[in-house]
């Protein structure tokens, strides 16, 4: 299954990585590892994670206050947001 990050989601990943890197480079690396693990888990069983909004699903990163919001289109897994839990819920719906 192909995985594609929406440009805004990719920007959210980079912003979070930079924030962690400024405070703790190991935390920044751990964030990226956790996100890679999330992608692999979702790729293996995309329907396993709960629905979140219309047509989307949510994977909560266990060690960080972020959720990976994704949609499935045939053989494509589209990550539409990597949302911090303090952001307004559903801000990504127009993507």
Give the residues covered by each predicted segment:
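Enriched for short, Lys/Arg-rich terminal
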Residues: 67, 71-95
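Basic, Lys/Arg-enriched alpha-helical interface segments
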Residues: 2-58, 73-76, 92-95
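A short catalytic or substrate-binding loop motif that flags glycine-/basic-rich loops and adjacent residues
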Residues: 60-63
């Amino acid at each position: 299954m192909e995985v594609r990050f929406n440009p805004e989601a990719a920007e959210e990943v980079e912003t979070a990585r930079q924030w962690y890197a400024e405070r703790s480079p190991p935390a920044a690396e751990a964030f990226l590892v956790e996100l890679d693990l999330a992608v692999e888990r979702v790729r293996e069983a995309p329907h396993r994670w709960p629905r979140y909004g219309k047509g989307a699903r949510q994977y909560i990163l266990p060690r960080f206050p972020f959720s990976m919001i994704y949609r499935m289109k045939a053989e494509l897994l589209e990550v539409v947001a990597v949302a911090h839990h303090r952001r307004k819920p559903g801000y990504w719906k127009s993507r």
